[in-house]
Amino acid sequence: LQSPQPRVITTSSLMHRHGRINRDDLQLKQSYETQRAYNQTKLANLLFARELQRRATVAGSHLISVAAHPGVALTGIGTNRSRQGLLSLKDKFVGLFLKVLMPLLGQNAEQGAWPLLHAASLEPIEPGGFYGPAGFGEMKGPPKAARVGTVANDQALATWLWETSEKLCWVDYSALGKPPVDKSKKEIIDAV
């Protein structure tokens, strides 16, 4: 991070748009489902990337934080779900969708890496940006700016998640400072 313009790339997913952060059960000890955990994790990743950029900017750092998603990439994600133990009906449906439709709607793993490579190496890049495939539904195609789900724009939620993560991981990133929360943004945190 000491380079003239360090860049942090965080992998998210289209599924972040279905993610919800439950502050009372962040680690899903009471309500674990495979797909729910995946969606929440990918939302948390995007919130983290955007919060890191906000904090780096406030601290006067040249760090650039961006996130990217691979779209629907043909990897083992759809074929290895049965090894995850007891699956809910919803998880089984998602598994069937992945197994049947991924080959039709998706792209190979190499093409899925394009948005992440774009985020990591191309100039100019939007600090705090989010990138994914340009094709139908952002499922495949060359990289472009991706659509950010509503909850991923919640600055209050991002701040809460950042501070909670610091406590859970026993780390302190106070050197980055704490940016003010934009009160003009609708706070969604209590609704999720």
Give the predicted meaning of each segment:
Residues L1-D91, K167-D182, I188-A191:
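Rossmann-fold NAD(P)H-dependent dehydrogenase/reductase core
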Residues K29, E33, A37, V100-L101, ...:
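Short amphipathic alpha-helical segments at helix-loop
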Residues T41, K92-A146, Q155-T159, E163:
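C-terminal helical subdomain
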Residues A73, G106, Q155, D182-K183:
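A generic alpha-helix propensity feature with a strong bias for hydrophobic helices
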Residues I125, V151-L176, V181:
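Hydrophobic transmembrane alpha-helices of multi-pass solute transporters/permeases
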Residues M139-P142, K185-I189:
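Short, solvent-exposed polar/charged micro-motifs at secondary-structure junctions
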